Amino acid sequence: MADHYTLRLAPGVRQRLSERARRAGLQERTLAQRYVEEGLRHDAHPLIQFIDGPSGRRASLLSRGLDVWEVIATIRDNNGSMAEAAEYLQIPTGLVEAAVAYYGEYRDEIDREIELNEAEYERGRAAAAAGEQALRS
């Protein structure tokens, strides 16, 4: 169960929160909770930002367009080498290290995103194979 917390907002902040929540189809308290959680995560991991996408809200490297799960999956694909992953992704090793630091704290979340991506890839492969089979028959 969540803890109750009362907060006074500066003039205009509540109105902007209300408008943003309405546009996002969320309750104000849900959006405020998300902002607090993501703000705390960003304070601890300043090279990580949070963005919306087809699979929902996710952690990504600031100004890079790479999700944390993509960096972690690439490290795994390179036998755990952060240097090789950085070279493959064409990003500084420091950004790979930032993704690894975030992963260390939110491993279950990132592993779940990797699993979802792998499942989606397999569905796509199966659909492509079925399409190729249909073309041959």
Question: Which stretches of residues belong to each language-model region?
Answer:
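Short, solvent-exposed alpha-helical "recognition" segments
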Residues: L40-A44, E97-R112
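Short, amphipathic alpha-helical "recognition" segments used to contact nucleic acids or chromatin
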Residues: R64-N79
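Short, basic interhelical loop/turn and adjoining N-cap
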Residues: L26-Q27, E87-A98
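Intrinsically disordered, low-complexity basic tails/linkers immediately adjacent to helix-turn-helix/homeobox/MYB/SANT
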Residues: P54-L62, I114-S137
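Short alpha-helical "recognition helix" segments of helix-turn-helix
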Residues: R20, E84-E87
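Short, Lys/Arg-enriched anionic-surface-contact patches
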Residues: M1, H42-L66
